[in-house]
Amino acid sequence: MLRLEDLPGTREEPIFVKAETPGEVVFTGKSQFGFSGQYVVVTGLVFRDMYGLMDAVEFRAGTKSIAHHCRLTECVFEQANKLPDNQKTRWLSVHGEEHRVDSRYFAGKANEGATVVVWVTEKPGKHQLDHNHFGPRPELGTNGGETIRIGTSDVSELDSRTVVNDNFFQECDGETEVISNKSCGNTYRNNVFERCAGTLTLRHGHRCLVDGNVFLGEGKADTGGVRIVGRKHRVINNYFEKLQGDSSRAAIALSSGIPNSPLNGYVPVVDALVVHNTVINCEQSLRRRG
């Protein structure tokens, strides 16, 4: 376990935590890495076959030592071998405010737990996840196989205002929610989803924007598009082609919901804007369902 606490970087002079030779510093097994402070850049590290701990990498060095205005870039997270147990593990937990996670590769996660989790508190995090490659993730067979989750149902009425843009999602088949949105005010823009057996799911929360994304099913079973639950979402300028999912995995699926739904239920779709989307050769273009 490596924890770096309260690193005092500044915007003008950030602190760098980096491999002397990129790609040759490898964390593996029951390793854990956490850091806190501000204006810290972590780069060039490899995290391989991580298991046995709930969070492999965290933007914090303890529950009361949280990072702010930091960046994780040019790192690799991968599972290359079968793990000795199937204990739930999240590869990356993003705590704090205004972090950037970019230019990284994630692939092969086969155990339970989201690949990346953004935690939501009373103060909007305003994070950015951009230019990452999320490679193949095999089907888990149960919940807990999201590639990205932003928030949880109990805080889903709070704003995160996280931006997820210009990422490549490739065969992310962990579960039906490739991205699980569970907070308010987030933006998903210019991402490409290729052969992913699931959807970008606005599961909880309101006022999110899904703009300019590309969903390519290539005829693969269960490939889906955008699933909408909640109020005042905007789904605009997206492209859907050869998706084979139906019902909740249709190209665009809107939930009828439950009146007076609890936070962990299904809030009806209200005041959604769904315009200027292109749907080509999909099994089911638009579905309104309970």
Question: What are these language model-derived features?
Answer:
Residues M1-V26, F33-G44, H68-C70:
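Beta-solenoid repeat scaffold
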Residues L2-E5, G29-S36, R48-C70, E74-G290:
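Glycine- and acidic/polar-rich repeat regions and solenoidal domains
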